[in-house]
Amino acid sequence: MSLELIVMRHAKSSWSDPCLSDHDRPLNGRGRASAKAIGTWMKEEGYQPDQTLCSTSTRTRETLDQLELDTEPNYLEPLYHASEDRMLQLLQNRAKGKSVLMLGHNPGAAFFAQAILSKPPKSDAFSLFPTAAVLVVRFDTTNWRDLRFGQGTLAAFIVPRMLLPQT
């Protein structure tokens, strides 16, 4: 048995209310559409996580809602703007099941995605890890605690622009 990790950055958020804290910013219309499209893609491709580790921010919670996955979320305050090292630590200590979705923020999500793979995908978008980007990684291990940077094998990488019509 191998493990599967789905790393996702939250969808596009709204900056329309300057009084909101960064933590409380919601998704904008484009973000909701992008997250829905990613959720549809995940279902079509058979990516159904057993567990979700999600930042507590409003935009990550709303992104997760728009994905419409059949999984119980675990909201973790330490995932809010976590570094790649902190993300790995949370995964090693909190992940359960064969497949886990980790939903967070840049720059940590981008750095984590780059560090976890043995070989990055050939995609200009990968290094930027734009909003609602999804990386699916497989590991030849059965224990989340054994994960290390550089061990993951690319299964898929997608961004909303690959799924939605351009306007």
Pin down the residues of each PLM region.
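Charged phosphate-binding loop/patch that engages nucleotide di/tri-phosphates or the phosphate backbone
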Residues: 150-167
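Residue-level preference for the first positions of well-ordered beta-strands
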Residues: 5, 99-101, 134
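Domain-level recognition of soluble alpha/beta enzyme cores
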Residues: 120-155
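A glycine-rich beta-strand to alpha-helix segment
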Residues: 97-116
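Glycine-rich phosphate-binding loop signature in dinucleotide/nucleotide-binding domains
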Residues: 45-47, 93-98
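Short amphipathic alpha-helix with an adjacent loop that forms part of the alpha/beta core around
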Residues: 86-94
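Active-site-proximal alpha-helix that buttresses catalytic centers in soluble enzyme cores
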Residues: 2-86, 121, 129-130, 164-167
